[in-house]
Regions:
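Conserved C-terminal alpha-helix-loop-beta "cap" of PLP-dependent enzymes
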Residues: 107-166
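Conserved PLP-enzyme active-site core in the AAT-like
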Residues: 1-104, 109
């Protein structure tokens, strides 16, 4: 039985689960690592040689390795990963604190808020809180009003690029 951690939201910049006992860590290269919404990639990381050899065999025999251009796109994104993660986190903290003051917002879920139940754990095992937050509003009508009113925020199915998404 292996402990597998999806580290997509924090990236290796903010958290390294192998240091805390994870056997396998998964990163979506499509998200923060790539950072430009222009490639499709994923990574599996382990420090277990037996698992590594099994994964290497699967990758080689199924042709699941990345093309050179996709590798270049990910490497290009990693060059700016630090500044993008820091700025995204700064913005998330500001937005979370602003949302807490809005009368229609009933709850803000963001581990960077001191009242979040995972705040202390995050401080111990990560170097940051990331940029992902969510919130509840009081009525469906207010939720629809928010969705229809946003101008700078894009509707999208992916994350980690330069756009703010809802």
């Amino acid at each position: 039985l292996y402990l597998i951690v999806d580290n997509t939201f924090l990236s290796p910049y903010f958290q390294n689960p192998l240091k805390f006992g994870a056997d396998i860590v998964i990163h979506s290269g499509t998200k923060f690592l790539g950072g430009h919404n222009d490639t499709l990639a994923g990574f599996i990381v382990t420090n277990n040689e037996e698992v590594q050899e099994k994964l290497r065999f699967i990758i080689k025999t199924t042709g699941a390795g990345l093309a050179p251009f996709d590798c270049w796109l990910i490497l290009r994104g990693i060059k700016t990963l630090g500044i993008r993660m820091e700025r995204s986190q700064e913005n998330a903290i500001k937005i979370a604190n602003w949302m807490k003051k809005q009368p229609v917002v009933k709850h803000v879920y963001y581990p960077g808020l001191q009242e979040h139940p995972g705040y202390e754990i995050m401080k111990k095992q990560a170097r940051g809180f990331g940029a992902m937050l969510t919130f509840d509003v009081d009525t469906e009508a207010h939720a629809l009003q928010i969705l229809e009113s946003v101008r700078m925020i894009k509707f999208a199915e992916s994350l980690g690029g330069v756009e703010t998404l809802i």
